[in-house]
Every structure is written in structure tokens, then in C-alpha cells.
A protein has these predicted regions:
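Secondary-structure transition/capping motifs at alpha-helix termini
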Residues: 63-71, 91-97, 113-117, 144-150, ...
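NTP-handling and nucleic-acid-processing catalytic cores
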Residues: 3-13, 49, 135-358, 363, ...
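Long, His/Glu/Asp-enriched segments that create or flank divalent metal/ion-associated functional microenvironments
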Residues: 442-479, 484-488, 494, 743-747
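N-terminal catalytic cores of NTP/NDP-binding nucleotidyl/phosphoryl-transfer enzymes
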Residues: 25-96, 100, 123-138, 245-246, ...
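Residue patterns forming the tRNA-binding/recognition surfaces of aminoacyl-tRNA synthetases
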Residues: 2, 11, 15-19, 91-241, ...
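Helix-rich, typically C-terminal accessory recognition domains appended to large enzymatic cores
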Residues: 79, 144-160, 250, 409-438, ...
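Long, charged, mostly alpha-helical binding arms that flank functional sites
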Residues: 3, 224-229, 363, 371-399, ...
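Conserved oxyanion/phosphate-binding beta-strand-loop segments in alpha/beta enzyme cores
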Residues: 1-36, 66-75, 99-106, 282-323, ...
Length: 797
């Protein structure tokens, strides 16, 4: 049989679609399996090979589950709001809706050409009003529960995109969209109180099957620490500066304080500050720096001492200077820190630069040269002197500050509340109204969805104002509460909004009464297997876990965690070993591979490249190798024989069933394919195989190369689909070779080998072994040992 992929692949894609083979059935009596991949952003560039690898893991598992008798939900959709589409619309004058529709059609065609077994009856699009109605509904539920608030703050702002960015979207001081430098800007921002769920998000990680590095990244991002809040009096005022520290045991070593340049204490006591001009100049410089630049550890220590304000160390009553410095942020902690230069290198460098006292309170090191950051005996600390256990000294200090009324134990999180508004057009409208009498009022639920108006100009204003603010007919409205004149909120939600709950909509995509029917949620949730990239571990995954946990607390969903299992894929690098990029000219178009070698070759190759979670370079020669493998598989059709196959080949088949089955579950796809390649070699060596053996082979290969295997299945006389036939089962006793080669030791040294049957009698094995090494047996044989299936040992004297 020839591997005529251009005919075969179109044929089977149409057959699958016509027969609705991959459509999931709600409430089936079968055991359910919900497989999920991160739905794509449909860019104008179309699909790339990274998409193929990302989707192929759960694709293979989902196909295997169907063959194992599961009711499988394996859906796909499009995360289609976002800046790239809007920027292209601004550039070309084409409406984002038109661009999105074109990109969706292109992506859909590309995905179908690869033969993914998605349930196309459940496709979702986050820009569809029927979808974002429920995004707005969930937002309003959060608003009702006090999880939405508005504040003026220094934010990460991209001057190029003219949009506010969350910390997650501006890592490294660069815009995640256009990679421009981010600046700090004071703006009014809508936040979601994700910090209220920090503990629940941490606890939830104990109940899910995520890779260790995924859990670790989420734990680090949430960043829970235990310590104490301590109040420092400001001399000559009624003010108290509250700080948070994880090392309250070092309070006797505090010799100065640092507050954020934006701290309100400065303006409140400006008349007491002698060097206000220097303070203002430093503030101006800070406004030019990004948050990333301000918080870098390796940089020159800058700051200004506030002349006229002094803090008081609550433990010893000593007056200590207060500085402003750029590395302290109002958005982190309390906007003020205590400094213990003897035991913190940044504080040490700062103290040396500004001539501040350094008092050692933990014995060790040489503080004339550097800070001592290790453990040791407490000194210069009154009631703590002599303590050597850090945990005990912290507990004792917390007890003391509580008794003194100057502090208490506390917990802090590195994660900050989620900046949730964008000053752009192509996003979900925020369903809130600003009323001069009633304040901020929610749009009534029965008026959802609040739809985007049709506009011609998508550019934001130069001051970063949303394009929607220019549309009077949209902005001006009546207050839902009092009926008076009011104005709509003109910012839109970030792209992360729709992806925070999309997996629930797949369950019931056409429901107009709820985001999904509760009985269907109870049947399908949680997601059994979710695959995606490491780049979404600390953004999308944390956001979606937060939204899902909120819905769980409302009683809207049945599980506290949305994803039972998470896996990750590594990058596909260019043939040169570098990350693929258009500028480097090393991008591989997956449809070129489909056109030249077939979808089955592409599917097989991306999983054969190496460890699924690791990065691997593209290799054209290996692509061709996978094509040759599939051609050899097609050739096996002509090798089917009624003559019985050898016992050795039968063992090879049972071994392959066992190995491929376990490898798929462990995402060891490369070794599963290698096993099938080796089995092909065994078949060709034998020169024949039975029809039943060929059927087993193509069932094992089907999840990887479904088009070719369906064609072979049909050629063997079947009129049903291989994709829903029964997954092969192995017999454990048949996974052991009928004969094995074992070593023969004489006086501890291997002198030969003997081929033995797995159940062969001991005496027969020893007799043949002695015959093989007869010339090595000098003297008398004093001991003969046979360890079945392992070794023969003969001792002579």
C-alpha cells in the first residue's frame, strides 16, 4: 500500500467531520475525560509549529481515551481580543471584527488540515457578545462581593501601546506586547482583589497534579512570607510609619528607615522638611524610571535624607534618619521599610554610601567589609542576647512588640492586586456607570452584554484615554439606580479576562441563561488534563484559578480547582538552535510540512523530537525520517500473512502495547514512537505479520498518525472508524522474551553466553552452559549456580 497522504488526509478529515466522530456527548454513561489546550490568539501570522506541539500532547491522550471507551471532550476556541489586532486595525483602517473573523477562518482551516480531533461543535470566541456577556457577568459578581475597586496609583504604562499594564505584562521593564520600555505613570486603575485569594491559591496547589517547576513558579509568584508589622513613631508628630519585616528579631539593629518617594508623609509635612527642593528633584527623577529599574538589586544606591523628619526605633528609643529611595515602592508592602545594614547587603551598601551607623545584632562575619547574612548568636539586643535559634528569637520579639503595643505578627504576599483595565477599544467593555449622585453603579444583569459600539477610529488619546471616551452616544447614559445623567466606564478589560473562565463555556457554549448549565458543569469538571506553555504559569493559570475559586465560593461550580492535571511543552527552536523569529529567517511554516510530507508526518515528528517538556531544534532530516517510517508502515499492509508469526514477534507486540500505553500517559511520546519504529523493524525482519498484529500496530499508531492508520483499517475490511475502536491490551506473561541470552561466569569472570528458554529446566541450562565453556573449566567443579533468566555461575578449584 502506498502512503498517498494528499488523498488520504482530506478523505478522512471529511469522513470524521461528516460522522461527527469527535463530538462529546453530555451525560454519557461512559467515564468522562476533559482534555484542554490553551486556546490560541488568532494572529494574522497564522499557526506556527509551536501550536502543533502544544496541542499534540492532549490530542494523543484524547484519541487514546476515546479508544479506551471514554466520553471525551476535547474542545478548541479563540482568545481573540487583544492589542495586536487593534494595532493592525489602526494601521490599516480595517475594523478589528473583520480582521478577527478572517484570522479565525484561517486558523480553523489550518487546525483542521493537521487532523486534530477537536469537537468543532463547541468552538468559542472571546470577542463574541454571547461569550463576553458572561465575562461581564462574572466581573459584576466580583464587583458585588467587593473584589473590584478603583485607586489612583503609579502604574506600568506603555507609551507606544498607550495602555496600562499589569506587573505580569511588563516583566523586565518591557511591554509584553510591543517590547517597548515601560514608564511609571499616575492613573486611576480598576483592580481585582486577587490578593484576597492568595492563601486559597497556595492551598489549592496541594490538591492538583502539576509539574514541580509549575507549582514552584506559582508559589514564588504569590510569594507568601511570615513576619511582623511594626510601627515606628515619627519624632515630633502623631504619625506612625508601619513597616513589614520577616526578621523582627533584628529590630535592635535598625539604624535608619526608607520610604517611597511618593509616600504621602512627605507632602503632609513639607513645611517641616528643610530640603524639599532636593526631595522634589529626586521624585522627578524617579518618575522617569520603570518599576523594574527601581527594584533592581545590582545598581547604584540613590536616595535623599529627609532633613526635618526622624523616626524612633521602638525597641531602644533612638532617633533614626528617614530617607527616600527609589527601590521602595508604594505599591509594595506599606511603602516604608526598616533598614538593618549589619545584616542586609542592600541596607549595608546604602548605609556606607550615606554614612549611617551600622550596629551588629547577630554574631558572625566581618561587618567592616560586608553585611553578615547568616545565622548566629544574638548580641546587642537586650532580652534576645544569647538566643541562637532564629525561629525562637523571632517568636520572642513578636511577643515583645505585641506586649508593647507597637506591632504584631503578620503575613505578606509578593503578588499584588490585578490591574484590570486597559485604555483600548478591542476588549470587553467594563459594565459600570459613573453617577455624580450614586457613585459607581453596576449595569443591570438583564442589560448584558454591554456591547462595544461600532467605531471608525480606534486610536487611544495622547493622554492614554480609551477610544470609547470619544463616543458621546456610548459614554452618556442614565444611572441604573437613580435615573439621572451618568457616564459609562470607557476602559475595557485586559485580554486575560476571557481566558480566565473559557474552559467552563466549552461545556455549554450556546447557553443564553447561564455561563454553563450546572448539571453539565458537575458532569465535565474539573478539566482532567491541561497542557500549555511555561510562559502562562504565572499569569493565565493564576488568574483562571482565581476566577474559578471565586465561582466555587459563589456555589456556581463544583470544584475549587479548575485543572486536575497540568503538563507543559518545550519550545521548538529553529534549525540553527535559536528561538524561531521572522527576523532570523528560521521560522518553519507547519502547512509547508503538511503540503510536502503530510499532516501525519508533521504530527509524528513534533512528538518524536525529544523530551516533550524540553526545547529542541527543528531538523528537516528527522522530518524525512518520520515520513519514511510512515511509508514503511503503509508497506506492512502487503506483508499480512495467514501463516503464524514467530513467538518472538508476538512478544514484541505485547511489549509494544505495554510501552506505548505507559509512555503516552507519561508524555514520553518520543519513546512511544521509537518503540513503534523498532516494532516495524521487527516486522520487516520477520517478513510477515498477521492481520490481527497489523490491527494492533495501527491502533497504537492511530493517536499519532490517524489519517494513514484509518486508511489501513479500512483496507483491512472494517467499515467503522479506527479512532473509536478498542485500545489494545497486553498480556503480562507475553511481554517476556521466549528466549534470552544470559552470561556464563567461571570463577567470577564472564566466559561466554547461552541462549535459554524462559521456562527451561535448570539441569538443561547448566549442561549446555558447561558445554559452551568447557575449555575454561580447569580443575574440579565445586559449585554450579543458575539464577533463572539472569546468569550461570560455575566455580572451579
Amino acid at each position: 500500500m502506498r502512503h498517498n497522504f494528499k488523498v488520504i488526509e482530506k478523505k478522512w478529515q471529511k469522513k470524521w467531520e461528516d460522522a461527527k466522530v469527535f463530538e462529546a456527548q453530555d451525560f454519557s454513561d461512559k467515564k468522562k475525560f476533559y482534555g484542554l489546550v490553551e486556546f490560541p490568539y488568532p494572529s494574522g501570522a497564522g499557526m506556527h509549529v509551536g501550536h502543533i506541539k502544544a496541542y499534540s500532547s492532549v490530542e494523543v491522550v484524547s484519541r487514546k481515551r476515546r479508544m479506551e471507551g471514554y466520553n471525551v471532550l476535547f474542545p478548541i476556541g479563540f482568545d481573540a481580543f487583544g492589542l495586536p489586532t487593534e494595532n493592525y486595525a489602526i494601521k490599516t483602517g480595517t475594523h478589528p471584527r473583520q480582521i478577527t473573523d478572517q484570522n479565525l477562518a484561517r486558523f480553523t482551516d489550518q487546525l483542521k488540515r493537521v487532523g486534530f480531533s477537536f469537537d468543532w461543535s463547541r468552538v468559542i470566541d472571546t470577542t463574541d457578545e454571547k461569550f463576553y456577556k458572561w465575562t461581564q457577568w462574572i466581573f459584576l459578581k466580583m464587583f458585588e462581593k467587593g473584589l473590584v475597586f478603583r485607586d489612583t496609583a503609579l502604574v506600568n504604562y506603555c507609551p507606544s501601546c498607550k495602555v496600562v499594564l499589569s506587573n505580569e505584562d511588563s516583566q523586565g521593564g518591557k511591554c509584553d506586547i510591543c517590547h517597548s520600555e515601560v514608564v511609571q505613570k499616575s492613573k486611576t486603575v480598576w483592580y481585582l482583589k486577587i490578593t484576597e485569594y492568595a492563601d486559597k491559591l497556595l492551598q489549592g496547589l496541594k490538591d492538583v497534579d502539576y509539574p514541580a517547576n509549575v507549582k514552584q513558579q506559582q508559589e514564588n509568584w504569590i510569594g507568601k512570607s511570615t513576619g511582623a508589622f511594626v510601627n515606628f513613631d515619627v519624632d515630633g508628630t502623631d504619625e506612625k510609619l508601619q513597616i513589614y519585616t520577616t526578621r523582627p528579631d533584628t529590630l535592635f539593629g535598625v539604624t535608619f528607615m526608607v520610604i517611597a518617594p511618593e509616600h504621602p508623609l512627605i507632602d503632609k509635612y513639607a513645611d517641616k522638611i528643610a530640603n524639599m527642593d532636593a526631595i522634589k528633584a529626586y521624585r522627578t527623577e524617579c518618575q522617569k524610571k520603570t518599576e523594574f529599574e527601581r527594584t533592581q538589586l545590582v545598581k547604584d544606591k540613590t536616595g535623599v535624607k529627609i532633613e526635618g523628619l526622624m523616626g524612633i526605633n521602638p525597641m531602644n528609643g533612638k532617633k533614626i534618619p528617614i530617607f527616600i529611595a527609589d527601590y521602595v515602592m508604594m505599591g509594595y508592602g506599606t511603602g516604608a521599610i526598616m533598614a538593618v545594614p549589619a545584616h542586609d547587603q542592600r541596607d549595608y551598601d546604602f548605609a556606607k554610601a550615606f554614612g549611617v551607623d551600622i550596629i551588629q545584632v547577630i554574631k558572625g562575619g566581618d561587618i567592616s567589609k560586608e553585611a553578615y547574612t547568616g545565622d548566629g548568636e544574638m548580641i546587642n539586643s537586650e532580652f534576645l542576647n544569647g538566643f541562637t535559634n532564629k525561629k525562637d528569637s523571632i517568636a520572642r520579639m513578636v511577643e515583645e512588640i505585641k506586649k508593647m503595643g507597637v506591632g504584631e505578627a503578620g503575613v505578606q504576599f509578593k503578588m499584588k492586586d490585578w490591574a484590570f483595565n486597559r485604555q483600548r477599544y478591542w476588549g470587553e467593555p467594563i459594565p459600570l456607570v459613573h453617577c455624580p449622585s450614586c457613585g459607581v453603579v453596576a449595569v443591570p444583569y438583564d442589560e448584558l452584554p454591554l456591547e462595544l459600539p461600532d467605531v471608525k477610529n480606534f486610536e487611544p488619546g495622547e493622554d492614554g484615554e480609551s477610544p470609547l471616551a470619544k463616543i458621546d452616544s456610548y459614554v452618556n447614559c442614565k444611572c441604573p439606580k437613580c435615573g439621572g445623567d451618568a457616564k459609562r466606564e470607557t476602559d475595557t478589560m485586559p485580554q486575560w479576562a476571557g481566558s480566565s473562565w473559557y474552559f467552563l463555556r466549552y461545556i455549554d457554549p450556546n447557553n443564553d441563561k447561564a455561563f454553563a448549565d450546572r448539571k453539565k458543569i458537575d458532569y465535565w469538571m474539573p478539566v482532567d488534563w491541561y497542557n500549555g506553555g511555561m510562559e502562562h504559569v504565572t499569569r493565565h493559570m493564576i488568574y483562571s484559578r482565581f476566577w474559578h475559586r471565586f465561582l466555587y465560593d459563589l456555589g456556581e461550580v463544583n470544584t475549587p480547582e479548575p485543572y486536575a492535571k497540568r503538563t507543559i511543552q518545550g519550545l521548538i527552536l529553529g534549525p540553527d538552535g535559536d528561538k524561531m523569529s521572522k527576523s532570523k529567517g528560521n521560522v518553519i511554516d507547519p502547512l509547508d510540512i503538511v503540503e510536502d510530507y503530510g499532516a501525519d508526518t508533521l504530527r509524528t515528528y513534533v512528538l518524536f523530537m525529544g523530551d516533550y517538556a524540553a526545547a529542541a531544534p527543528w531538523s528537516d532530516s528527522s522530518v524525512k525520517g518520520c515520513k519514511r517510517f510512515l511509508e514503511r508502515v503503509a508497506g506492512m499492509v502487503d506483508m499480512v500473512s495467514d501463516d503464524p508469526s514467530t513467538d518472538a514477534l508476538e512478544v514484541s507486540f505485547h511489549k509494544a502495547i505495554k510501552k506505548v500505553s505507559s509512555d503516552i500517559e507519561e508524555t514520553k511520546f518520543n519513546t512511544a514512537i521509537a518503540t513503534l519504529m523498532a516494532l516495524t523493524n521487527s516486522v520487516y525482519s520477520a517478513g510477515k505479520l498477521s492481520k490481527e498484529q497489523l490491527e494492533i500496530f495501527i491502533k497504537l499508531l492511530c493517536p499519532f498518525a490517524p489519517h494513514l492508520t484509518e486508511e489501513i483499517w479500512e483496507s483491512l475490511g472494517h467499515d467503522d472508524f479506527l479512532s473509536v475502536s478498542a485500545w489494545p491490551q497486553y498480556e503480562e506473561e507475553k511481554t517476556v522474551d521466549a528466549t534470552i541470552e544470559i552470561g556464563i561466569q567461571v570463577n567470577g569472570k564472564v566466559r561466554g553466553t547461552v541462549l535459554v528458554a524462559k521456562d527451561e529446566d535448570k539441569d538443561a541450562v547448566l549442561a549446555r552452559a558447561k558445554e559452551i565453556v568447557a575449555d575454561k573449566l580447569t580443575g574440579n567443579i565445586v559449585k554450579e549456580i543458575y539464577v533463572p533468566g539472569k546468569i550461570v555461575n560455575i566455580v572451579c578449584k
